[in-house]
From Swiss-Prot:
Gene Ontology biological process terms, A to Z: DNA-templated transcription
Any one Gene Ontology cellular component term annotated for this protein: DNA-directed RNA polymerase complex
HAMAP family referenced in this protein's UniProt entry, alphabetically: RNApol_bact_RpoB
Function noted in UniProt: DNA-dependent RNA polymerase catalyzes the transcription of DNA into RNA using the four ribonucleoside triphosphates as substrates.
Transmembrane portions of the chain: none
Class in the EC hierarchy, top level: transferase
Reactions catalysed according to its record: RNA(n) + a ribonucleoside 5'-triphosphate = RNA(n+1) + diphosphate
Family according to the record: Belongs to the RNA polymerase beta chain family.
Species of provenance: Pseudomonas syringae pv. tomato (strain ATCC BAA-871 / DC3000)
Protein name: DNA-directed RNA polymerase subunit beta
UniProt keyword annotation of Transcription present: yes
Quaternary assembly: The RNAP catalytic core consists of 2 alpha, 1 beta, 1 beta' and 1 omega subunit. When a sigma factor is associated with the core the holoenzyme is formed, which can initiate transcription.
Annotated GO MF terms: DNA binding; DNA-directed RNA polymerase activity; ribonucleoside binding
Length: 1357
């Protein structure tokens, strides 16, 4: 097996038993693929597929004018180049987007000609606004912030059948309903009422009998009955009737007379109920007709009109109940044939017939008018208006679209075989839905489960952006139609017709403020990936928190392998926001698919198929862990399987599919929890969620006990630097890596140089620090997709969210009561949990009414000491250590002229000055913040002079760019001359460059020439001369290209910045704040075991083992049993073994043992105790030594979820590490030196520091701002508010009878304005008295009572 550059430096011992059939797919594919599909960038006119932008344009164009004399057609579109790259957009606070240019064709028809001859055609490109681009990591930069568009899980379009679960009617009767949901357009509902009539609703308005809709479609009563019922035919023979017999229809009826066969034998006696046995006998006897008395048809319903044979007079309309009067008329008129509807109470109810009876309309027009009245109450209906409205509802492609998915789901549900068809409904569709609904009511067929993932689909970014874009285009369409009529008379061009503002506004609104456009969670790489793999049921067209019930939030059997059953937020959104499972993907219809291995007759193949929830229902699917022999055959007699969404057991021969991996059930975050199978689900949920809140520590530390997914997450998240192409590291420093690309990967005519600029100390969305550190050194060979630099929270290309801590589970002096955590001071000294937070502070200079604000170091009434960190431009220098209240940017604002006192006038006359007409509005460091300035950015509006600081920043940026380009040129030049050298050495020169004719060229000769002189050489072979010329041209060409690139960047830097109206200058100051761990910070493990640091103890007081090694953390053992997250105990044991093995390897290295011994010991670890075998023999001795050095701090282990280390393997590892197999050891109290009375579980657990830091929450106030109306102090840290002394606290003081304290709280400390000013003055004077007055809220109360018209006054004595 081949190891990558970083993998072979530190191999993880993997305990998995099952082979990798399939790698975990690229984790951001769902975002990138969807948006790539939407843009179709780089496609030519013929290559456009009917999706995304192209589809949106095609659905709106051509736009035809109202008169029909002009049309605007769509030809194609192209995307321009982005103005700035991603980093520049983030810095400048602009959107990373490309201009969209659409080619349209304006066609003007000749009015005079009859056949619409074309008079004029104009074609033009029109600018249609900017389209945001997705970065390579699946995010968008909108106004300088990284955002993610979360995918939405919504109800698929199609038709759904349901019932009310007996809740509507008091009898508990099930009322069935059907609903046709289009992708866009009106909803159509059919429903039964308690009397079993069918009603229809359009867009949830008032209901009408369903027959009204059928009549509006043009069906007559007879056609409707014909469609829904079969008929019984009776031939009238005198007093009796002969029934054309269909024996099946008699089942369950009571025989009205003896039924005899041809031979006169009685088959059914009169008065007996007819059973299936009787029907068999009747079918055998072959009776075709049955004679029944006339009153047999009483109460039956006619299926056809009964007409008097002689006069043509109508005796009974169709759908009329036959009574004795009608029967009398029939007998009189000698009618020969009567057709009645066949209905019964079991499986063929008279529902449609009953509905027709309550329907007041009798023809199509009346039905259309009735629908018009329901849709537009109060408007007078006309025939045309009614017809237009009805046609637009379901039959017009502009207003109604089922979409391809909707049509597919619709056809499948009503039992058709073809899955394609029109996007609008037709008559047959509506009748088919009604038939299916009636069948379900009759007991044939079942209702749908709307939480089944076959009925819910995922809308990804691309699709939602397309919908928004279409909305914008439809707005444009209206305006264009108006203007088209003027187009021919005024000779307008397409550009004059189209106003792109509505489109741009719709797109901007979607990306900027849609509910699904979320601020990217950038705490750590895992939170980024999770954010992009989210699936939300909320958002436009989705559910709302308040209305979502339990069923929607619950785990459904179809979630298996598609949506993670564990990872979802706690709180009101539980179950509505989910995460995609590790292997899930969407199919072309947007349904989630999961991969399976194909199983044929008990033999498991390596063929993999992706199936959606609907497709997998009929399969019998075995678990990934099902037992197999070497021939890949299932060997158990019965295998645990899933079939029809149920868990059962089946014989191996019945199995058709098998899971690809045990971790296919869970999401990325859950698959990072080792021993997940031993944790309670609720705690696993907390563990998954808390990993996303871990703050990247100063020095990342890989988990000793991981799951093997860490490398995938780090690689796919995009925080690491991954080699685009293989090659040799040419140079490397802290901020860039330069790779000379391997010859076989260089494309012709390009430099063969890859320069990777590393991100240094940049602020993330969550104010954490993003910093990349190189892993490679000069001369190293790297392959494509090797990891060359670590990002935040990654260690050698593996995700590293926390630190491995030595922990003990023991109750200790109550310091770890109720989940508190007791830490050792060593953790602080070693900076294990020190994190860097970067804060961005902004100072804006605006143009005010009284004049412009100015950024300057000349600030009135501020001492020298306060200005000592500012430069002459008034901006703090980089590297300054600043604390709360320090000035970062000096700024003065003009203030209005005030009336001067005579003294001031005199002073002014003497000192002559205008300093007092400005006030100090400088940017200061906020309270509670202390840090180092690491960067300053200055943005200046066009036309405003740039200060010295802005110019120096620009110069340093230009130098950086120049250095990059020079480096690139140096390598290009070097590589070119190397190729020339290999071509020239050993060849003969003709002269030139001071050489004689016939002289052989050697390395020494070439070294003696300057590079420029090489091109003057004349060689004997023409091919070589040509090569020299080409090389010279290539180098000149590259130089010119790089100079152009530099000029382009320079132009961008020097042009003014696009600032908001009224803003002259913006200065951004970045502060790096170092936060050590301290009491009050929240910490957690990966198993939902969270707690708050309660105390930090000196190292010498901590419990220690017999060797004197103290523990770092003491955790409470009582936190484990009730919470049932035993995974943390197993992790602790395995962590102890991992650390012990590392120490053994360290001792071997210190004793300088032979490599062969090292190999033997490593082989014991990796290949002799269960799990995956590692090919250590492929590594050279140096690589083995490198590996051993990296294993000194512990051998990292991987225990994949549901396929991890067994207890026996953990014990074997402990034994190999010379540790007690129980995982427990005798500890001693550091303060007394006494032994604790029983052995304690000690080991290594991976602990995270969460982004809930006490520094961000701690807050105190003495005086500050007050609310405007009530004059009470504001609340909350952000407003610098006070602590609320609430109702219950008042009761407490009342209960103690502390009257003066209570009075103080309710008056001078709250909203007694005069009292609190006096109090302040008294304290300043050293006189500690208070004079309480009237609280302001009392005055508010009086005002409110007066506003009710009650005159109220306070009587003061």
């Amino acid at each position: 097996m081949a190891y990558s550059y970083t993998e072979k430096k530190r191999i993880r011992k993997d305990f998995s038993k099952l082979p990798d059939v399939m790698d975990v797919p690229y984790l951001l594919a769902i975002q990138l693929d969807s948006y790539r599909e939407f843009l179709q960038a780089g496609a030519t006119k013929d290559q456009f597929r009917d999706v995304g932008l192209h589809a949106a344009f095609k659905s709106v164009f051509p736009i035809i004018s109202y008169s029909g004399n002009a049309a605007l057609e769509y030809v194609g579109y192209r995307l321009g180049e982005p103005a700035f790259d991603v980093k520049e957009c983030v810095l400048r606070g602009v959107t990373y987007a490309v201009p969209l240019r659409v080619k349209v064709r304006l066609i003007i028809f000749d009015k005079e000609s009859s056949n619409k001859a074309i008079k004029d055609i104009k074609e033009q490109e029109v600018y249609m606004g900017e389209i945001p681009l997705m970065t390579e990591n699946g995010t968008f930069v909108i106004n300088g912030t990284e955002r993610v568009i979360v995918s939405q899980l919504h109800r698929s379009p199609g038709v759904f059948f349901d019932h009310d679960r007996g809740k509507t009617h008091s009898s508990g009767k099930l009322l069935y309903s059907a609903r046709i949901i289009p992708y866009r357009g009106s909803w159509l509902d059919f429903e039964f009422d308690p009397k079993d009539c069918v009603f229809v609703r359009i867009d949830r308005r008032r209901k009408l009998p369903a027959s009204v809709l059928l009549r509006a479609l043009g069906y007559t009563t007879e056609q409707v009955l014909d469609a829904f019922y079969t008929t019984n035919v009776f031939h009238v023979r005198g007093e009796n009737l002969n029934l054309e017999l269909v024996p099946q229809r008699l089942r369950g009826e009571i025989a009205v007379l003896d039924i005899l066969d041809d031979k006169g034998k009685v088959i059914v006696e009169q008065g007996r109920r007819i059973t299936a046995r009787h029907i068999n006998q009747l079918e055998k006897a072959g009776i075709k007709e049955l004679e029944v008395p006339l009153d047999y048809v009483l109460g039956r319903t006619t299926a056809k009109v009964i007409v008097h044979p002689a006069t043509g007079e109508i005796i009974a309309e169709c759908n009329t109940e036959l009574n004795t009067e009608i029967l009398g008329k029939i007998a009189k008129a000698q009618v020969v044939r009567i057709e009645t509807l066949y209905t019964n109470d079991i499986d063929c109810g008279p529902f449609v017939s009953d509905t027709l009876k309550i329907d007041s309309t009798s023809n199509q027009l009346e039905a259309l008018v009735e629908i018009y009245r329901m849709m537009r109450p109060g408007e007078p209906p006309t025939k045309d208006a009614a017809e237009t409205l009805f046609n637009n509802l379901f039959f017009s492609p502009e207003r109604y679209d089922l979409s391809a998915v909707g049509r597919m789901k619709f056809n499948r549900r009503i039992g058709r075989t073809e899955i394609e068809g029109s996007g609008v409904l037709c008559k047959e569709d509506i009748v088919a839905v009604l038939k299916t609904l009636v069948d379900i009511r009759n007991g044939k067929g079942i209702v749908d489960d709307i939480d089944h993932l076959g009925n819910r689909r995922v809308r990804c970014v691309g699709e939602m952006a397309e919908n928004q874009f279409r909305v914008g285009l439809v707005r444009v369409e209206r305006a264009v139609k108006e203007r088209l009529s003027m187009a021919e008379s005024e000779g307008l061009m397409p550009q004059d017709l189209i106003n792109a503002k509505p489109v741009a506004a719709a797109v901007k609104e979607f990306f900027g403020s849609s509910q699904l456009s979320q601020f990217m969670d950038q705490n750590n790489p895992l939170s980024e990936i999770t954010c992009k793999r989210r699936v939300s049921a909320l958002g436009p067209g989705g559910l709302t928190r308040e209305r979502a019930g339990f069923e929607v939030r619950d785990v459904h059997p179809t979630h298996y392998g598609r949506v993670c059953p564990i990872e979802t937020p706690e709180g009101p959104n539980i179950g509505l926001i989910n995460s995609l499972a590790a292997y899930a993907r969407t199919n072309q219809y947007g349904f989630l698919e999961s991969p399976y291995r194909v199983v044929k007759e008990g033999l498991v193949t390596d063929e993999i198929v992706f199936l959606s929830a609907i497709e997998e229902a009929d399969h019998v699917i075995a678990q990934a862990s099902a037992a197999m022999n070497d021939k890949q055959e299932l060997i158990d007699e019965l295998v645990a399987v899933r079939h029809l969404n149920e868990f059962t057991v089946k014989a191996p021969a019945d199995v058709t599919l098998m899971d690809v991996s045990p971790k296919q059930v869970v999401s990325v975050a859950a698959s990072l929890i080792p021993f997940l199978e031993h944790d309670d689900a609720n705690r696993a949920l907390m563990g998954s969620n808390m990993q996303r809140q871990a703050v990247p520590t100063l020095r990342a530390d890989k988990p000793l006990v991981g799951t093997g997914m860490e490398r995938n997450v780090a690689r796919d998240s995009g925080v690491c630097v991954v080699a685009r192409r293989g090659g040799v590291i040419d140079s490397v420093d802290a901020s860039r890596i330069v790779v000379r690309v391997a010859d076989d990967e260089v494309e012709t005519g390009e430099a063969g140089v890859d320069i990777y600029n590393l991100t240094k100390y940049t602020r993330s969305n969550q104010n954490t620090c993003i910093n990349q550190r190189p892993l490679v050194s000069k001369g190293d060979r790297v392959q494509r997709s090797d990891i060359m630099a670590d990002g935040p929270s990654t260690d050698m290309g593996e995700l590293a969210l926390g630190q491995n801590m030595r922990i003990a589970f023991m109750a200790w002096n109550g310091f770890n009561f109720e989940d508190s955590i007791c830490l050792s001071e060593r953790v602080v000294q070693e900076d294990r949990f020190t994190t860097i937070h970067i804060q961005e502070l902004t100072c804006v200079a605006r143009d005010t009414k009284l004049g412009p604000e100015e950024i300057t170091a000349d600030i009135p009434n501020v001492g020298e000491a306060a200005l000592n960190k500012l430069d002459e431009a008034g901006i703090v220098y980089v590297g300054a250590e600043v604390g709360a209240g320090d000035i970062l940017v000096g700024k003065v604002t003009p203030k209005g002229e005030t009336q001067l006192t005579p003294e001031e006038k005199l002073l002014r006359a003497i000192f002559g000055e205008k300093a007092s007409d400005v006030k100090d509005t400088s940017l200061r460091v906020p309270t509670g913040t202390k840090g180092t300035v690491i960067d300053v950015q200055v943005f200046t509006r066009d036309g405003v002079e740039r200060d010295a600081r802005a110019l120096s920043i620009e110069k340093s940026q230009l130098d950086e760019i120049r250095k990059d380009l020079n480096e690139e040129f140096r390598i290009v030049e070097g590589a070119t001359f190397e190729r020339l050298r290999s071509a020239l050495v050993g060849r003969v020169a003709e002269g030139g460059a001071g050489l004689k004719k016939g002289q052989e060229i050697t390395n020494e000769v070439l070294d003696g020439l300057e590079h420029g002189q090489w091109f003057k050489l004349r060689m004997a072979e023409d091919a070589l001369n040509e090569q020299l010329e080409k090389a010279q041209a290539y180098i000149v060409d590259r130089r010119r290209l790089l100079d152009d690139k530099f000029e382009d960047k320079k132009r961008k830097l020097q042009q003014g910045d696009d600032l908001a109206p009224g803003v002259l200058k913006i200065v951004k100051v970045y502060l790096a704040i170092r936060r050590r761990i301290q009491p009050g910070d929240k910490m957690a493990g990966r198993h939902g075991n969270k707690g708050v640091v309660s105390v930090i103890m000196p190292v010498e007081d901590m419990p220690h083992d017999a060797n004197g090694t103290p523990v770092d953390i003491v955790l409470n053992p009582l936190g484990v049993p009730s919470r049932m997250n035993v995974g943390q105990i197993l992790e602790t044991h395995l962590g102890l073994a991992a650390k012990g093995l590392g120490e053994k390897i360290n001792r071997m290295l210190e004793e300088q043992r032979k490599v062969i011994e090292l190999r033997k010991f490593l082989n014991e670890i990796y290949n002799e105790i269960g799990g995956r075998q590692e090919a250590l023999e492929d590594l050279t001795d140096n690589e083995i030594l490198d590996l051993a050095k990296n294993l000194r701090n512990g051998v990292p282990m991987a225990t994949p979820v549901f396929d991890g280390a067994k207890e026996s393997e953990i014990k074997a590892m402990l034994k190999l590490a010379d540790m007690p197999e129980s995982g427990q050891m005798q500890l001693f109290d550091g303060r007394t030196g006494n032994k604790f009375e029983r052995p304690v579980t000690v080991g290594y657990m991976y602990m995270l520091k969460l982004n809930h830091l006490v520094d961000d929450k701690m807050h105190a106030r003495s005086t500050g701002s007050y609310s405007l109306v009530t004059q009470q102090p504001l609340g909350g840290k952000a407003q610098f508010g006070g602590q609320r002394f609430g109702e219950m606290e008042v009761w407490a003081l009342e209960a103690y009878g502390a009257a003066y304290t209570l009075q103080e709280m309710l008056t001078v400390k709250s909203d007694d304005v005069n009292g609190r000013t006096k109090m302040y003055k008294n304290i300043v004077d050293g006189d500690h008295r208070m004079e309480p007055g009237m609280p302001e809220s009392f005055n508010v109360l009086i005002k409110e009572i007066r506003s009710l018209g009650i005159d109220i006054d306070l009587e003061t004595e």
